């Protein structure tokens, strides 16, 4: 007991000397965190042996000491890594290397030079928020090398530069939805207005902004009525979330359920108009009735993009049954789009059917065992399946390194992390992406059953013509 108390007093004297000296070298900051680590380990050992007080200091619970020890170990590793970089010789104070600064937005980055950014909503000085913009931000790139960059602010938010890309770590529109009534705000830096009042509509080139692909305007005019509920649903999702989701993402299930009833009603009207334009022969009547049943099932999960002028083709691009094959063969030949062959992975290929022109797009040779000649042709027509992961760059990179060893044999390949870039600029949009490819849909299903994705990482399904 006395020996334990003496060691604890020595650590307290060491910490007091560090605080009194106020050194601004990185070596002294590493020494400070090493002392905090030893202090947490000593308190953990004391509590584990039933000691409840060391001098006048109560011994904290085991969980508290363990958390502080792990926190100190993490900071020591980060500072030692920074010490090996060209920025290790700069001035580093206790505030610059504190856990509060390191965990502040942007998280897990070293930062220097805090600057106050005031955002005033609706022109009311009493209705304002204060944000911290850091003059310099130190981050680790994909090659595990420390980089130093500058931070800035505009009408969209506060960002730091990664090369020529702007990575936003504060978006003013997020708080404007809660605090602003008119959707307007102005930005002040050091009590000087740098941006006049703007509305809360997110600019197209900012993260979370809606962006149309070329030809999307023309396609929206010619789309069937079944698309209108999903377009309104996607607009609502863009306003509510920072990053857009694909329809295959699990986060959009609630949005699809809300519009399913409207899709059914409008789908019936669209099919009735399609049948009125089709030939009145008995064969096409039977195919239309069968197609309507398969379409009603397909519309629950897949979205249709059928042009109005296309005769005898199902309004759902993925709800294909035997009737849809018969009707498409009786009409004029129409090439199928690539999007109509993706998404509904859980449906059987034998039930849905694939046209002969699509056979041969799969990269891997399919075994004909227990499937027959027809089943092998249908399987060969499928595109290679993939999983798209979205999350932080470091999180995705760590997950890839662990999964490559832990789940070997349950996937084909991993990609490096990448990001979307704005069409009219060089800004990165949203979070980082990572692709996982598979040799078959069965392998992908087994991978999803086996793997547990990290917190904050979402995924969606897809496929490509070639990898």
From Swiss-Prot:
Residues 383-467 are annotated as: DNA-binding domain. InterPro entries: E2/EBNA1_C_sf (IPR035975), Nucleotide-bd_a/b_plait_sf (IPR012677), Papillomavirus_E2_C (IPR000427), PPV_E2_N (IPR001866), Reg_prot_E2 (IPR033668), Regulatory_protein_E2_N (IPR036050), Regulatory_protein_E2_N_1 (IPR042503), Regulatory_protein_E2_N_2 (IPR042504). Residues 197-210, 277-286, 309-318 have a biased composition (Low complexity). It is found in: Host nucleus. Residues 196-367 are annotated as: Disordered. Residues 216-235 have a biased composition (Polar residues). Keywords: Activator, DNA replication, DNA-binding, Early protein, Host nucleus, Phosphoprotein, Repressor, Transcription, Transcription regulation. One of its GO terms (molecular function) is DNA-binding transcription factor activity. Pfam families: PPV_E2_C, PPV_E2_N. The keyword Transcription regulation applies. The keyword ATP-binding does not apply. One of its GO terms (cellular component) is host cell nucleus. GO terms for biological process: DNA replication; DNA-templated transcription; regulation of DNA replication; viral DNA genome replication. SUPFAM superfamilies: E2 regulatory, transactivation domain (SSF51332), Viral DNA-binding domain (SSF54957). Phosphorylated. Residues 1-201 are annotated as: Transactivation domain. Its main location: host cell. Belongs to the papillomaviridae E2 protein family. Binds DNA as homodimer. Interacts with protein E1; this interaction greatly increases E1 DNA-binding activity. Interacts with protein L1; this interaction enhances E2-dependent replication and transcription activation. Interacts with protein L2; this interaction inhibits E2 transcriptional activity but not DNA replication function E2. Interacts with protein E7; this interaction inhibits E7 oncogenic activity. Interacts with host TAF1; this interaction modulates E2-dependent transcriptional regulation. Interacts with host BRD4; this interaction mediates E2 transcriptional activation function. HAMAP family: PPV_E2. This is Regulatory protein E2. The gene is E2.
């Amino acid at each position: 007991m006395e020996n334990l108390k003496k060691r604890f007093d020595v650590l307290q004297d060491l910490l007091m000397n560090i605080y009194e000296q106020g050194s601004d070298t990185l070596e002294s900051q590493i020494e400070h965190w090493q002392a905090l680590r030893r202090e947490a380990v000593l308190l953990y050992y004391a509590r584990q042996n039933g000691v409840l007080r060391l001098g006048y200091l109560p011994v904290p619970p085991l969980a508290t000491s363990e958390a502080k020890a792990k926190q100190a170990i993490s900071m020591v590793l980060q500072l030692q890594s920074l010490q090996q970089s060209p920025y290790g010789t700069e001035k580093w104070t206790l505030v610059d290397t504190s856990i509060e600064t390191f965990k502040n937005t942007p998280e897990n980055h070293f930062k220097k030079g805090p600057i106050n950014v005031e955002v005033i909503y609706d022109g009311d000085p009493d209705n304002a928020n204060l944000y911290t913009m850091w003059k310099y931000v130190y981050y680790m790139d994909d090659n595990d090398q420390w980089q130093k960059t500058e931070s800035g602010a505009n009408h969209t938010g506060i960002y730091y530069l990664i090369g020529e890309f702007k990575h936003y770590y504060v978006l003013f529109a997020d708080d404007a939805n809660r605090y602003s009534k008119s959707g307007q705000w102005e930005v002040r830096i050091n009590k000087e207005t740098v941006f006049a009042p703007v509305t809360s509509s997110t600019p197209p080139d900012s993260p979370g902004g809606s962006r149309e692909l070329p030809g999307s305007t023309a396609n929206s005019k010619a789309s069937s009525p079944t698309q209108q509920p999903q377009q309104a649903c996607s607009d609502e999702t863009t306003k509510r979330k920072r990053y857009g989701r694909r329809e295959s993402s699990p986060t959009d299930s609630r949005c699809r359920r809300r519009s399913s009833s409207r899709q059914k009603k409008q789908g019936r009207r669209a099919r009735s108009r399609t049948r009125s334009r089709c030939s009145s022969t008995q064969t096409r009547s039977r195919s239309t009735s069968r197609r309507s049943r398969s379409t009603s099932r397909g519309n629950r999960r897949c979205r249709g993009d059928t042009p109005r002028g296309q005769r005898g083709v199902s309004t759902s691009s993925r709800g294909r049954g035997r009737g849809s094959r018969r009707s498409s063969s009786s009409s004029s030949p129409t090439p199928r789009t690539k999007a109509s062959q993706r998404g509904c992975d859980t449906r059987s290929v034998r039930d849905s059917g694939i046209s002969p022109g699509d056979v041969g797009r799969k990269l891997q040779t399919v075994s004909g065992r227990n499937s027959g000649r027809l089943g092998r042709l249908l399987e060969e027509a499928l595109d290679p399946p993939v999983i798209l992961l979205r999350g932080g760059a470091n999180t995705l990179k760590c997950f890839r390194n662990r999964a490559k060893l832990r789940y070997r044999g349950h996937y084909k390949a991993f990609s490096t992390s990448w990001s979307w870039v704005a069409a009219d600029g060089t800004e990165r949009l949203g979070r980082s992406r990572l692709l996982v490819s598979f040799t078959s849909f069965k392998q992908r299903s087994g991978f999803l059953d086996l793997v547990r994705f990290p917190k904050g990482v979402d995924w969606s399904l897809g496929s490509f013509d070639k990898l």
